[in-house]
UniProtKB/Swiss-Prot annotation:
Superkingdom classification of source: Bacteria
Annotated residues for binding of ATP: K293
InterPro entries: aa-tRNA-synth_I_codon-bd_sub2, aa-tRNA-synth_I_CS, aa_tRNA-synth_I_cd-bd_sf, Lys-tRNA-ligase, Rossmann-like_a/b/a_fold
Name of the featured protein: Lysine--tRNA ligase
UniProt source species: Rickettsia bellii (strain OSU 85-389)
Gene that specifies this protein: lysS
Taxonomic classification: Bacteria, Pseudomonadati, Pseudomonadota, Alphaproteobacteria, Rickettsiales
């Protein structure tokens, strides 16, 4: 065994931990189908949100970790539940009145309200695929509609008929009395209306491959369960897919957690082997509510990428997948700066075990680019933007180049992009919410002390020396907690309650410019 493989096996990074579970479930052997199958699912009832990206990003992290631990081939599929009936009209789509006329119709049978694709479902699928393609995910796309209609699930659907009673024994105890009376694993597609029906099944015949039910007019209808004439309820459908496709690894959100045992049991009843599963926590919006595609109460992928590099979004997805996290615009600067820190640590680290534990290793699948920001963070750029209110990034570069003469847009593309992102973020989220503190007499005395200290400093002084000077003034200012001292300075000078290390900020902004800023406050 190579040293690299030994270090990967010893790694406690969660993608390696998940990969080891998969390898153990296979006893280290290649499955009969010749590859290990990773599956992600997508419900195209609304526009793809950042959680959809997150599931695929995390899945690929595990897939790549597995490939490092073994020589077994892998495949990733993205499965779209586009045959589901529409249950409610999303609030963030055009022509909602038109869509409302197609309730309970399969998503691929509803006209596209955007007017671009052959159906609502096709449009949503195209949106998903476009951003998966944009980020270089290697996957195969599976459509529920196409799979059902092409007969790819026919064998398993007949088996559901054969095991009907066993499946019902598992399912019925999970429902209230009124639902027990109407539940069936099968949902026929009405031959007259095309709707996905949730109706009681009065007869089922595994030999004929049919079910019998009464439609809304009381007419007895017999339909085959094959070739797209029926689809399964979502819980049995999940299990059937695992058995039919021989899925080896699946992730799902906490809203599925209570059903994990059911999925696995039904999969076994159908003759399949349940995959290794990871249940991840759901993202919450700024109010602590679950984000939703149909509500549109989340940050979209496009939103994030308007203000930050994709690596920062991938870092957000990597961190603590089993812990609930609030997802709103305030998290963007923090994740950009954390990515910069992790990237720098990775390239300074010689211990391979520690490199394997670094999030950037998994974000970039072991091929981590080296970025250079010359000690300038996204937060620092936001604060610089706050005081100089630039019309474009060239203004910021004037300060950056003076701070670090080696830094130029052409040799620091990452920093160049950050400057552009910072201006956008400041204009959209910070500018309107700035609230300056009017300095008291005590504050004015402190500001005068800082001004006097700065007057005696050369422009080439180190940021740490400036920081020490400000710190020493704070120690003499009579604050019980120095945190309150710095908070007051941030509110007076920057109009916000927190901020950067002032020494670094002053070095970047310039001593003379900072003196002018302080004089304005006096």
């Amino acid at each position: 065994m190579s040293e690299i493989l030994e270090d990967a096996i010893k790694s406690k990074a969660w993608p390696f931990e998940e990969a080891k579970k998969i390898l153990d479930s296979l006893n280290g052997k290649t499955p009969e189908k010749g590859y290990v199958l990773f599956e992600t699912g997508y419900g195209p009832s609304g526009l793809p949100h950042i959680g959809t990206f997150g599931e695929n990003a995390r899945m690929v992290m595990v897939q790549k970790a597995f490939e490092q631990l073994s020589n077994i081939k892998t495949k990733l599929i993205c499965f779209s539940d586009d045959m589901d009936g529409l249950r409610k009209v999303p609030s963030n789509i055009p022509n909602p009145e038109m869509v409302a006329g197609y309730m309970d119709m399969p998503l691929t049978s509803i006209p596209d309200p955007f007017g671009e694709c052959e159906s609502y479902g096709h449009y949503m699928n195209a949106k998903l695929r476009s951003f998966l393609d944009k980020f270089g995910f290697e996957y195969e796309f599976y459509s529920s509609t196409e799979m059902y209609k092409a007969g790819m699930f026919d064998e398993m659907l007949i088996r559901v008929l054969e095991k009907y009673d066993e499946i019902m024994e598992l399912m019925l105890p999970t429902f209230r009395e009124e639902r027990k009376a109407t539940y069936s694993p099968f949902m026929p597609i009405c031959p007259k209306t095309g709707k996905v029906l949730q109706v009681p099944i009065h007869k089922w015949d595994a030999k004929l491959g049919t079910i019998t039910y009464k439609d809304e007019n009381g007419e007895t209808i017999e339909v085959p369960v094959t070739k797209g004439h029926c689809k399964l309820q979502w819980k049995p459908d999940f299990s059937m897919r695992w058995a039919a496709l021989k899925v080896d690894y699946e992730m799902y959100g906490k809203d599925h957690l209570a059903n994990g045992r059911l999925y696995s049991e039904i999969c076994r009843i159908l003759g399949g082997k349940p995959p290794v599963q990871l249940c991840y926590e759901l993202f919450l919006d700024e109010n602590g509510e679950k984000i939703s595609k149909s509500k549109g109460n989340s940050i979209s992928v496009d939103d994030w990428l308007k203000y930050a590099p994709v690596e920062s979004m991938a870092l957000f997805m990597y961190q603590n997948p089993t812990r609930a996290k609030r997802l709103f615009f305030d998290v963007i600067p923090k994740n950009v700066d954390e990515y910069i820190t992790f990237n720098q640590k990775y390239h300074l680290e010689e211990d391979r075990t520690k490199r394997f534990a670094n999030p950037v290793y998994h974000i970039h699948h072991g091929n981590v680019p080296k970025i250079e920001t010359f000690g300038i963070t996204y937060s620092l750029l936001l604060n610089l933007t706050s005081v100089c209110n630039p019309s474009d990034k060239s203004v910021l570069w004037g300060f950056i180049s003076r701070y670090e003469p080696k830094a130029m847009p052409n040799n620091s593309p990452y920093l160049d992009h950050l400057a552009e992102f910072a201006i956008r973020y400041y204009n959209d989220f910070v500018k309107a919410h700035k609230s300056y503190l009017a300095p008291s007499e005590k504050h004015k005395a402190i500001l005068q002390d800082i001004l006097d200290m700065l007057k005696g400093l050369p422009e080439q002084i180190e940021a740490e020396s400036i920081q020490k000077g400000i710190y020493d003034i704070g120690m003499k200012a009579g604050y019980e907690n120095l945190r309150d001292y710095f908070k007051d300075l941030y509110q007076i000078l920057l109009g916000q309650s927190d901020g950067p290390r002032l020494g670094t900020f002053i070095k970047l902004y310039g001593i003379s410019e900072t003196m002018k800023l302080i004089e304005e406050k006096l």
